[in-house]
From Swiss-Prot:
It comes from the Bacteria. NCBIfam families: PRK00346.1-4 (NF001490), PRK00346.2-2 (NF001492), surE (TIGR00087). The gene is surE. GO terms for molecular function: 3'-nucleotidase activity; 5'-nucleotidase activity; exopolyphosphatase activity; metal ion binding; nucleotide binding. It comes from Desulforudis audaxviator (strain MP104C). Belongs to the SurE nucleotidase family. HAMAP family: SurE. This is 5'-nucleotidase SurE. SUPFAM superfamilies: SurE-like. It catalyses: a ribonucleoside 5'-phosphate + H2O = a ribonucleoside + phosphate. The lineage of its organism: Bacteria, Bacillati, Bacillota, Clostridia, Thermoanaerobacterales. Its main location: cytoplasm. Its EC number is 3.1.3.5. The keyword Nucleotide-binding applies.
Length: 257
């Protein structure tokens, strides 16, 4: 079993190290490639207007553990699968992210987008996040990834060319696991406008997350709030097929347009 690990928190992030330690004896080979610094909320952006620099990642003792990329999480996986790796991995795992990736936030998430890039390149992929900002709680998320890995390989038919698994682990001790759909996540007071010493406005993206749909236990947001691990299958195909069928019924000759 060959696994590619990545993240959006940076090559030396404790979540990535916790994941590597948890899976090291289950994999024949673990490759690691990650950004040179935190690249949260970069979405699926890739770097096209400047060169991308890659170097080996080495600890102070001289042991090298992977590649550092001065690009986005999607850059990392794209480079690994299309250029750097000597062989195609069996699985891409992105995480463990410090902080949740729930609901519509998956569209902003560098963590989920890195897994999506693996999927685009034909490799089954997972994204895993800790719904907490306390680094000491990575142990539970890493242990769940370890328990899940044999199931992922036994039932790998779930991974079509169109689907990845987005996993969110609640803080503390989870009380169970739920299979969920994406919730609807919004932010109250999302833009914080300030004034610099020269009288010019500048802005911070901030805000408190909330779900306008209220508490729904069938969503990833509701599951994590109920202290359950959430597993959500996420599709790369964003086509609305019902709307597509409805458009075909419009009195318009699309072919002649």
């Amino acid at each position: 079993m060959r696994i590619l690990l990545t993240n959006d928190d940076g090559i030396f992030a404790p979540g990535l190290e916790a994941l590597r330690n948890a899976l090291s004896d289950l994999a024949e080979t673990i490759y690691i490639i990650a950004p040179d610094r935190e690249r949260s909320a970069t979405g699926h952006s890739i770097t096209v207007h400047r060169p991308i620099r890659v170097r080996e990642a080495c600890h102070a003792d001289g042991n090298c553990c992977g590649w550092i990329v001065d690009g986005t999480p999607a850059d990392c996986v794209k480079l690994a699968l299309e250029s750097l790796l000597p062989e195609t991995p069996d699985l891409v795992i992105s995480g463990i992210n410090l902080g949740p990736n729930l609901g519509t936030d998956v569209l902003y998430s560098g963590t989920v987008s890195a897994a999506m890039e693996g999927l685009i390149n034909g490799v089954p992929s997972l994204a895993i996040s800790l719904a907490s900002h306390r680094e000491a709680e990575f142990e539970e998320a890493a242990a769940f990834a370890r328990r899940l890995l044999p199931l992922v390989f036994e039932y790998r038919e779930i991974f079509t060319a169109n689907t990845l698994l987005n996993i969110n682990v609640p803080p503390g001790k989870p009380v169970g696991v739920r299979l969920t759909r994406l919730g609807n996540l919004r932010y109250a007071d999302a833009v914080d406008r300030r004034v610099d010493p020269r009288g010019r406005y500048y802005y911070w993206m901030a805000g408190k997350p909330f779900s306008p749909d209220g508490h729904d236990p069938d969503t990833d947001i509701g599951a994590v709030k109920d202290r359950h691990i959430s597993i959500t299958p996420v599709k790369i195909d964003l086509t609305d097929y019902e709307a597509l069928d409805a458009l075909k019924k419009w009195p318009v000759d699309w072919k002649g347009s």
